[in-house]
Amino acid sequence: MTLKEYKSGQAFPGVIGRTFDVSKPACPAPNRAREGAPNVLFIILDDTGFGHLGCYGSPIKTPNLDALAADGLRYNNMHTTALCSPSRSCFMTGRNHHSNGMSCITEGSTGYPGGNGNIPFENGMISEILLQNGYNTYALGKWHLTPAEQTLSLIHI
């Protein structure tokens, strides 16, 4: 039973003990990542290649990224469209950019199949998979996955 299903006047389905630690709420415990599950951090950078990060042998000093890479996974075989929106949509869904409706950057959405700038709901995103497995998710920074006509532009105010 969830809290939304619990109605006043019904028998309380939980347990109210003398202390919190021996009490049980009416709703089930939230899904949690398994014990020892790794932390997951994705960093997506535009206009960056192997020659820009120290962890790939670059002379450019990137100590914080190098430290993260030393304790995590580093990808060295990848595909890019050389455009941010299509590449980001591939990364976020694990699908080809045309199946995501991202044949180009969202400002260039064509309205044709594979180029409407809208990721289909059924394609899902990695954040949804993580949530289903008890992870908390957070996105920060440039999104650039919405067609221009669906965003607020200061030019039109």
What are these regions (language model features)?
Residues 1-155:
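Formylglycine-dependent sulfatase
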